[in-house]
Amino acid sequence: MSGVVADTSALLAALFAEPQRDAVLVALSEADPALLSSCCLLEATIVAQSRLGPEGPAELERLLEAFNVEIAAFTADHSAMACDAWRRFGKGRHPAALNILDCCSYALAQASRQPLLAVGQDFARTDIELVELIG
């Protein structure tokens, strides 16, 4: 597999042992590179601490290190792409109902021309290429 952009939903599915955990881990292990928006790192860290307590961020960091996930800085170009994604697919505007951080993942996938690794159906209602999760 080529590179992927990981959405927060995929990382949290792996971290919290949700049903698609194994498929997400396979996709991450095959990705070269696996990218994560710095905005989504913030979101994942907050959710990890909220759900797992003080050890949550360290567990997330171990997951990111184990799969060599690269943190991509969120740039002005990404911001413009994310705004466009919100106009086209945002919550209250489109059935995909992307939130702000979904739009950040969308923008990084678009900018890097990599498929998006996500769990759930929101992104399937957009035009972004998705990683097919098997298993």
Place the predicted regions along the sequence by residue.
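Short, well-structured N-terminal submotif of metal-dependent ribonuclease cores
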Residues: 1-36, 49-62, 134
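Short loop->beta-strand "edge-of-pocket" segments that line small-molecule binding or catalytic clefts
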Residues: 4, 33-35, 67-72, 115
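A generic structural signal for short hydrophobic patches within well-formed alpha-helices
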Residues: 11-12, 41, 123-124
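Anion (oxyanion) recognition and catalysis
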Residues: 28, 65, 110
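Active-site neighborhoods of divalent-metal-dependent phosphate/nucleic-acid chemistry enzymes
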Residues: 70-115
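Acidic, PIN/NYN-like endoribonuclease modules and their adjacent C-terminal/linker elements
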Residues: 106-135
